[in-house]
């Protein structure tokens, strides 16, 4: 049991390091651009920062959604221990993505965000996805699970429309080559399709078990 706990701690440490590596690299490159005027972030550093943080937010969201199917396929219940962590990191990257847009793109004129939301559909869906993530991040603790009881599960089903909105945000943002957003859309469709199939299978199994036995002839 102790060995298993050590393994989980080691795995969580590795996940923390892997997930924080992209933002650490981005921070270092931003510092180089800011202090030395280097081209570490390409010709458009602001666009590069927004792209990378948004992409990692989407990736981590999809990885979070993949935890349940992976647990069901492998039988490894320990995978559930990583779901909350990955979901919070998805929110973290989404928040950095939004902050970069407000601070670097709008240059602090944050009131413009409301004009942008009205004018640009991809910003509308992206901002909506972030807003929906906020209550999920706040209520991700054990304390909130106890307070909300069954409503906790209902609330956290928002992760599904959030995934759809995030993919749509990326799809509308890309102007020409849609191969990358199409790939993420396909992954999301697979993850949601798996859940639908499992739910329908469970209903059929329940219906078979609850059906009355056939009448025996007299």
Swiss-Prot record:
Its cofactor is FMN; heme b. Belongs to the MsrQ family. Pfam families: Ferric_reduct (PF01794). It is found in: Cell inner membrane. GO terms for molecular function: electron transfer activity; FMN binding; heme binding; metal ion binding; oxidoreductase activity, acting on diphenols and related substances as donors. Binds 1 FMN per subunit. Binds 1 heme b (iron(II)-protoporphyrin IX) group per subunit. Keywords: Cell inner membrane, Cell membrane, Electron transport, Flavoprotein, FMN, Heme, Iron, Membrane, Metal-binding, Transmembrane, Transmembrane helix, Transport. The chain crosses the membrane at residues 14-34, 60-80, 86-106, 121-141, 155-175. Heterodimer of a catalytic subunit (MsrP) and a heme-binding subunit (MsrQ). This is Protein-methionine-sulfoxide reductase heme-binding subunit MsrQ. It comes from the Bacteria. GO terms for cellular component: plasma membrane. GO terms for biological process: protein repair. Disulfide bonds: none annotated. Its main location: membrane. It comes from Xanthomonas campestris pv. campestris (strain ATCC 33913 / DSM 3586 / NCPPB 528 / LMG 568 / P 25). Part of the MsrPQ system that repairs oxidized periplasmic proteins containing methionine sulfoxide residues (Met-O), using respiratory chain electrons. Thus protects these proteins from oxidative-stress damage caused by reactive species of oxygen and chlorine generated by the host defense mechanisms. MsrPQ is essential for the maintenance of envelope integrity under bleach stress, rescuing a wide series of structurally unrelated periplasmic proteins from methionine oxidation. It is a multi-pass membrane protein.
């Amino acid at each position: 049991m102790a060995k298993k706990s050590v393994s989980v701690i080691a795995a969580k440490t590795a996940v923390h390091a892997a997930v924080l590596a992209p933002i650490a690299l981005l921070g270092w490159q931003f510092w180089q651009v800011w202090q030395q005027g280097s081209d570490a972030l390409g010709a458009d550093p602001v666009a590069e920062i927004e792209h990378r943080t948004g992409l990692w937010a989407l990736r981590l969201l999809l990885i979070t959604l993949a935890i349940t199917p992976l647990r069901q396929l492998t039988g490894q219940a320990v995978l559930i221990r990583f779901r909350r962590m990955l979901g919070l990191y998805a929110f973290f990257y989404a928040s950095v993505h939004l902050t970069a847009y407000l601070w670097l793109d709008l240059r602090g004129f944050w009131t413009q965000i409301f004009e942008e939301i009205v004018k640009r559909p991809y910003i509308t869906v992206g901002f909506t996805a972030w807003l929906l993530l906020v209550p999920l991040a706040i209520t991700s603790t054990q304390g909130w699970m106890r307070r909300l009881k069954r409503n906790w599960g209902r609330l956290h089903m928002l992760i599904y429309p959030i995934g759809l909105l995030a993919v749509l945000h990326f799809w509308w943002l890309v102007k020409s080559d849609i191969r990358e957003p199409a790939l993420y859309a396909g992954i999301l469709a697979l993850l949601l399709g798996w859940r639908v199939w499992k739910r329908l299978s469970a209903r059929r199994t329940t219906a078979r078990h609850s059906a009355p036995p056939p009448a025996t002839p007299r």
